[in-house]
């Protein structure tokens, strides 16, 4: 009895017994918290897997990724609340596993993610954080943009399709003759064909060039901000579904004349 009393007195010096029980309950509730990924969130994860094959889940409603070359960074605000941290080395493989279940329920465990339904279950082991290329913790401070324009997805998609059909390796956002154009181009060949769509007006002259493979965007309309410092921000304007932001580096032969 005396020994137990001494132990409880020591506990009270740090926290009450009630607090200790609450902490214990929170701990076990964390690892038994059931959640499901919506179709929108699955689509975000599929998109992010094309940017970086790995991802680090963090507590909260934000998913983020960065390409291994650090030329693309993306962030999505999703409807689900991720309960704990967990690294996934092969995101496309995890998505494939989840597709085996008709109505997958997900639990974040200490060392793995458990995917299950009424009959089946998979324990998917987390990867070490050091194995995953992750975005910086600090939020991006985007420079004051010299150009800002809104692009409809149909126009962006049309130019990307044209680039594929015409075998053009780059997409350009250009300001010329008072218009903002999105173009499929080959900037290294001045005689190459150009496919262009007018998406706005401007009084500036510029040509910001992106590798086609770097424009890994989900099908939304976007507000595009362009900085002469070599970066562009694409922010989705959708009112329903995940809010997305992409930061994409421009190629070194981009130009801004003001």
Where are the predicted features?
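Short hydrophobic transmembrane-like helices used for membrane targeting/insertion
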Residues: 1, 21-22
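Long, charge-dense
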Residues: 131-149
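DNA polymerase processivity clamps
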Residues: 12, 19, 25-126, 145-258
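Serine residues within intrinsically disordered or low-complexity segments
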Residues: 3-4, 32
């Amino acid at each position: 009895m005396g020994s137990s009393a001494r132990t409880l007195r020591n506990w009270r010096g740090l926290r009450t017994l009630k607090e200790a029980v609450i902490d214990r309950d929170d701990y076990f509730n964390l690892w038994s918290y059931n959640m499901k990924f919506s179709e929108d969130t699955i689509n975000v994860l599929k998109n992010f897997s094309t940017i970086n094959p790995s991802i680090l889940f963090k507590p909260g409603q934000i998913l983020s990724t960065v390409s291994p070359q650090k030329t693309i960074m993306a962030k999505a605000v999703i409807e689900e609340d991720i309960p704990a941290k967990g690294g996934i080395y092969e995101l496309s493989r995890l998505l494939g596993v989840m597709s085996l279940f008709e109505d997958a329920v997900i639990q974040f465990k200490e060392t793995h993610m458990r995917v299950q339904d009424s009959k089946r279950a998979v324990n998917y082991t987390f990867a070490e954080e050091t194995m995953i290329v992750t975005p910086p913790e600090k939020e991006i401070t985007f420079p004051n943009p010299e150009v800002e324009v809104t692009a409809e997805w149909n126009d962006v998609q049309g130019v990307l399709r044209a680039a594929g059909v015409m075998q053009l390796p780059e997409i350009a956002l250009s300001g010329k003759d008072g218009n903002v154009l999105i173009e499929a181009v080959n900037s290294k060949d001045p005689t190459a064909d150009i496919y262009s769509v007018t998406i706005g007006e401007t009084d500036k002259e510029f040509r910001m060039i992106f590798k086609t493979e770097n424009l890994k965007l989900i099908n939304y309309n976007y507000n595009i901000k362009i900085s002469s410092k070599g970066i562009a921000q694409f922010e989705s304007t959708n009112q329903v579904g995940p809010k997305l932001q992409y930061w994409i580096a421009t190629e070194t032969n981009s130009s801004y004349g003001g």
